[in-house]
Amino acid sequence: MSTINQLVRNPRKKKVIKSGVPALDSCPQKRGVCTRVYTTTPKKPNSALRKIARVRLTNANEVTTYIGGEGHNLQEHSVILIRGGRVKDLPGVRYHTVRGALDTTGVDGRMQGRSKYGTKKSKK
């Protein structure tokens, strides 16, 4: 335990909590424009072609965002909405694209977990 003299000379430091999604500026989502849409490969031991986009946000930050689901319609200059949430096997990807919002279409033919992929309920 520290003495009072020690605490007067050197007070206790507050823990600094670092945000996992700094580019969002404490907002739930942010809008941005795609500057590049491409695929990349994940870290070992996984193997795939993950779809990602480089996005310039409304606060002038440039981030890399993951495009989830099967198939997408994004290209350069598409306006998209991003949310937080990293992709564990893609280094540097800390954001997800919100499907079904702005220029991004939902996933076609999706029956389960539709709300996460912006898909409307299908008519029987």
UniProtKB/Swiss-Prot annotation:
Cited CDD domains: Ribosomal_S12
GO molecular function: rRNA binding; structural constituent of ribosome; tRNA binding
Pfam families (alphabetical): Ribosom_S12_S23
Residue runs in coiled coils: none
Sorted UniProt keywords: Methylation, Ribonucleoprotein, Ribosomal protein, RNA-binding, rRNA-binding, tRNA-binding
InterPro entries in alphabetical order: NA-bd_OB-fold, Ribosomal_uS12, Ribosomal_uS12_bac
GO BP annotations, alphabetical order: translation
One GO cellular component, as annotated: small ribosomal subunit
Lineage top rank: taxon: Bacteria
Gene3D superfamilies found in the cross-reference section: Nucleic acid-binding proteins
Positions bearing 3-methylthioaspartic acid: 89
Free-text function comment from the UniProt entry: With S4 and S5 plays an important role in translational accuracy. Interacts with and stabilizes bases of the 16S rRNA that are involved in tRNA selection in the A site and with the mRNA backbone. Located at the interface of the 30S and 50S subunits, it traverses the body of the 30S subunit contacting proteins on the other side and probably holding the rRNA structure together. The combined cluster of proteins S8, S12 and S17 appears to hold together the shoulder and platform of the 30S subunit.
Subunit note: Part of the 30S ribosomal subunit. Contacts proteins S8 and S17. May interact with IF1 in the 30S initiation complex.
Family label: Belongs to the universal ribosomal protein uS12 family.
Protein's recorded name: Small ribosomal subunit protein uS12
The organism of origin for this protein: Ruthia magnifica subsp. Calyptogena magnifica
Source species taxonomy: Bacteria, Pseudomonadati, Pseudomonadota, Gammaproteobacteria, Candidatus Pseudothioglobaceae
